[in-house]
Amino acid sequence: MEFMVSMEEASQVATADQSTDSSSKSTSRIGSEENEILERRTILDSANNQPLLYIFKKRKGFTIVSADLRVMPVLAYSDKSNIDPNHIPNGVTLWLEMAKEKIREAKRDTSPPHPIVLKEWQKFLSRQLRTSDSYCIEWYQYGQYQCKYTSTQKGPLLTSEWSQRHLSTTQLSSGGDCDDCGRRFAGCGPVAMAQLEEFYHPNLARPRFSNGTCFATNAGQVSLGTLMQVMGSKSKASYNYMGTCATFTWPANVKSGLKDFGFSNGGNGNEAYNFALIKSELNGNHPVIFWGSTCLDCFADYHIWLCDGYLQHHYSDFNCTTKQCNQWSYSYLNMNWGWGNDSNGYYAFGQYNPDEGDYNTNLHVITGIRP
């Protein structure tokens, strides 16, 4: 219980301004009206009913905050996207399961929080935390100047926030009124493919958002619906899959579908999660496709989506024993989930503290996509 973060304390984190610059030592970041919390939800550990993390919907954007001091405070955030804390969409649910397991791992370790992590919490919380790192003479002499925080960011690359419904389905046949417009869902695979095509070969007549209206009234809206229909055909999408509203697309068919559409490469064969490779792709202005499910035949939570950016906080903490800087990076990936403006934002991947393992379960990545 010593390291537990209360809902009230997590709210202090959520209402602070999220910034790419984490170097501030101030504990008084003032939340603006846009950071006002509208809804909140506690995600509990099913094993012991203890909090693992908190989800905050704000007047503008959202923040997901850890419930334990042994992992970094901000796990995910956006300053513009919407989130419904009580109805988490596919894709986000996969990340959420991964985040919960990382926090469980940190809680199993009885060690106190790492100094880098604790100092990050101290920037947000009103209570004083006991840091284990007492500064030595070398820190005062040169360590504080030698060990500097930096950050790197790329993206977001996409300008579209398309979904599976409304204008995305105007060229699809009716099928159970799945999209509130009397038509089938476009499918997560075709949405990802269509957004890739729009990124590489933009048609600015197409709307940036597909939600909000059922019928196309101009050439750009018609073009969007047609592109979705073509991508569904190229990827052999199965509409109303197994008698449901789901539209299912195999990842292999996404790759071959992009190639058939005219891309020079629909994606490489190795789909193992590799942050360095993802970062390299994004630095080259190439979004990557993520896909996954909680198990091999768990089709209900299966999803395909795009990653179009990253943000890394590079921490440097002086070690009084070794007289060296301890380096560690905390990494976010920017996700465009293919649900319109729902839940898009930066999500933490890799290590949640410097002592933790780096694993990402049930996630696959398609890299090497080229127009």
Regions flagged by a language model, labelled:
Residues 6, 10, 42-47, 51-53, ...:
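Noncatalytic regulatory segments and standalone regulatory/sensor domains
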Residues 74-244:
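Active-site-adjacent structural segments surrounding the nucleophilic cysteine of cysteine proteases
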